[in-house]
Amino acid sequence: MTNMMKALVKAKPEEGLWMERVPLPEIGPNDVLIKVRKAAICGTDVHIWNWDEWARKTVPVPLVTGHEFVGEVVDVGSAVTEYRIGQRVSGEGHIVCGHCRNCRAGRGHLCRNTLGVGVHRPGAFAEYISLPQHNVVAIPDDVPDEIAAIFDPLGNAVHTALSFDLVGEDVLVTGAGPIGIMGALVAQCVGARKVVITDINPGRLALAKKLGVRHVVNAREEKLTDVMRKLGMTEGFDVGLEMSGSASAFRDMIDVMNNGGKIAILGIAPTGFEIDWNKVIFKMLHLKGIYGREMFETWYKMIALVQGPLDISGLITHRISADDYREGFAAMRSGEAGKVVMDW
């Protein structure tokens, strides 16, 4: 093994990413060195490519990007006991402090000192990545590499969907991006009654239908009240999963929620927006923000789901070499792709 590797780097404070040779990551006593097999492009990576306001405020330059991956252990620190060389693994992309109140209470996903892999520290768009052993997750033999490579966004979907009891409930998902589609499929898998997903992008809606979401709605062409009437719903949705970051979608969701309904909010809006808080109050709605994955309960549940009834393979629309990364980012930026997985 040489001391240099190929990596996709945010090398300059401007639009784009660049393939460069960078030093191999060093590992400490508690770290695991992983040879990356496959890595997927996330919406966060697109923000970093675009160098938008969030990226400019958040991402240090230069930085190896990427955080959705699967790979193989090639070296371990002297204190690592849980992982062995040759083992297939992925990793939790949020590095937590371990000493704040939430971490000490077992709520690491709420750590106030979280560092993001590929956002604050070197990431997975590289031949190798180093992670603390606490963040490494073993991948079962019956889970394919390309599915393990998208566990990070699947975890977002699972965390959001399983925030509330869904058995026998009517569920509205706003936003048919990859995470929204996976959230809808999870809801169906665990026993929701009616699951409706909305978007205004025909390509995304077609992908949702292809993957098996039962009720797919173009919000520009059909009113949710009409959809509810067709489905025999008389009182509104019990659970909402907001995956779009769209002000109009969120307002529409509030309008059609049943009294006492629960909304899990993962979609990030580009700017702040107003909602009618009187509706939230008088409907007695429960709003819950979602960030990342519960460590590590979400990982256990999503692995069990893909080993069982949940098939998300159709969500991967582009399989490319890492050298063709520009093509992959173009597909993601077009809004027409599902998941783009790169071979390293």
Swiss-Prot record:
SMART domains: PKS_ER (SM00829). The active site is at 44 (charge relay system), 47 (charge relay system). The keyword Cytoplasm applies. It is an enzyme of class 1 (oxidoreductase). This is L-threonine 3-dehydrogenase. Its main location: cytoplasm. It is found in: Cytoplasm. The keyword NAD applies. Catalyzes the NAD(+)-dependent oxidation of L-threonine to 2-amino-3-ketobutyrate. Belongs to the zinc-containing alcohol dehydrogenase family. It comes from Chelativorans sp. (strain BNC1). Its cofactor is Zn(2+). Binds 2 Zn(2+) ions per subunit. Keywords: Cytoplasm, Metal-binding, NAD, Oxidoreductase, Zinc. Zn(2+) 1 binds at residues 42, 67-68.
